[in-house]
């Protein structure tokens, strides 16, 4: 049993598992092609795109009903998010695979930080598995709750009347049992795509943020050994190794920022609408409301937001901690003034590059406040419109 748990908590196990369910390989061969099964991936994308079109058609038909439109908007935005994130992931797959290798490479040695990396990585995989269970619970409750209610109604009344909380305008009649079964099969692909794409991409971002943070800690461990090897007689004062490692780490941060910038931007923009739609479902309830799905989905959206914002915040804090340690450890009083400026100015300027962004957004705690305020403003507006036009 312990061996099985150790496998599940292995490096990138959750990410590799979820990407494999979509026909992708996160650790490809030398050719670097991550798309292992194009047919499976295309089926998932096509079924999701089809359901997105039916959601848009429903919103157009019911554009005067705020509650129904907000629920359809919630489903539509999540499908748009999944499609965009996976499209960006495929477009930048080579960069992401290279980023994974760069983050892993310093932790191969059997040192203290390598041991900490394995420990933190196992903890991260445990959190990723919990997040996967949240996404799976969202998908399962979304499909099984309406099916169970439909079967219960059929058993009690003998009438086949499908119950659904998915607001779509389908081009076929789901009141026929065989058509309803086919529609459920389509939804299996859609919900699997949502679950795996959300878990895979989001937890991969969290894994990269964890790796970069631990590399800063590793650099800090090297910095603490500086007093013993500081040599004023050398032209580089014995500090060249630290500066080389710091420059390499800054390149990794820049690579990390470049690889995930578009994905993070999609998350920030779409999550405001998602929060607004989710809140509206709680404050403006209606018939056939799937509260099990809403509960799981609320957890997923909140965790999703925390992964991106607090992950970026952790990288920034580790960089600041390294800067403070740099000033504390290096004997600046033994350096000539011109060398102090030569060392300090580039390092101070380089620290600004550790702020992870999403185009014109800077990921961190201030952005979290902005997202909640924006979602709250949209919710207040929709609630006012609902009270004015639909409660009288």
UniProtKB/Swiss-Prot annotation:
The chain crosses the membrane at residues 40-60, 76-92, 126-146, 178-198, 257-277, 288-308, 360-380. The atypical heteromeric and topological design of the odorant receptors appears to be an insect-specific solution for odor recognition, making the OR/Orco complex an attractive target for the development of highly selective insect repellents to disrupt olfactory-mediated host-seeking behaviors of insect disease vectors. Odor-evoked OR currents are independent of known G-protein-coupled second messenger pathways. One of its GO terms (cellular component) is dendrite membrane. This is Odorant receptor 1a. Expressed in olfactory sensory neurons in the maxillary palp. Disulfide bonds: none annotated. One of its GO terms (molecular function) is ionotropic olfactory receptor activity. One of its GO terms (biological process) is signal transduction. InterPro entries: 7tm6_olfct_rcpt. It comes from Drosophila melanogaster (Fruit fly). It is a multi-pass membrane protein.
């Amino acid at each position: 049993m312990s061996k099985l748990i150790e496998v599940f908590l292995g490096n990138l196990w959750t990410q590799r598992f979820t990407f494999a369910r979509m026909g992708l390989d996160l650790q490809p061969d030398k050719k670097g092609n991550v798309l292992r099964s194009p047919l499976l991936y295309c089926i998932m994308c096509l079924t999701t795109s089809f359901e997105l079109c039916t959601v848009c058609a429903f919103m157009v038909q019911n554009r005067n009903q705020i509650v129904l439109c907000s629920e359809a908007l919630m489903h539509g935005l999540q499908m748009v998010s999944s499609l965009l994130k996976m499209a960006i992931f495929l477009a930048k797959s080579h960069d992401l695979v290279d980023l994974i290798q760069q983050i892993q490479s310093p932790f191969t040695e059997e040192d203290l930080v390598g041991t900490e990396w394995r420990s933190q990585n196992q903890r991260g995989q445990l959190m990723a598995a919990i997040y996967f269970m949240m996404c799976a619970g969202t998908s399962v409750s979304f499909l099984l709750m309406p099916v169970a209610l439909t079967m219960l109604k059929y058993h009690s009344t003998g009438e086949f009347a499908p119950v659904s909380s998915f607001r779509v305008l389908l081009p076929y009649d789901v009141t026929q049992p065989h058509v309803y079964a086919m529609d459920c099969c389509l939804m299996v692909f859609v919900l699997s795509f949502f679950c795996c794409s959300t878990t895979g991409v989001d937890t991969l971002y969290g894994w990269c943020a964890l790796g970069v943070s631990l590399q800063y800690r590793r650099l800090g461990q090297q910095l603490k050994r500086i007093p013993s090897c500081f040599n004023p007689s050398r032209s580089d004062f014995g500090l060249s190794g630290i500066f080389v490692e710091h420059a390499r780490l800054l390149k990794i941060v820049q690579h990390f920022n470049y690889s995930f910038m578009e994905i993070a931007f999609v998350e920030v923009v779409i999550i405001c609408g998602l929060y607004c739609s989710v809140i509206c479902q709680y404050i403006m309830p209606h018939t056939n409301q799937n509260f099990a799905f809403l509960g799981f989905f609320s957890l997923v959206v909140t965790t999703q937001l925390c992964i991106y914002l607090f992950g970026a915040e952790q990288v920034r804090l580790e960089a600041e901690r390294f800067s403070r340690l740099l000033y504390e450890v290096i004997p600046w009083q033994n350096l000539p003034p011109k060398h102090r400026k030569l060392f300090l100015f580039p390092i101070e300027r380089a620290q600004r590059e550790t702020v992870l962004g999403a185009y014109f957004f800077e990921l961190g705690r201030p952005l979290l406040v902005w997202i909640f305020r924006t979602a709250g403003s949209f919710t207040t507006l929709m609630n006012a419109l609902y009270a004015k036009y639909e409660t009288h």
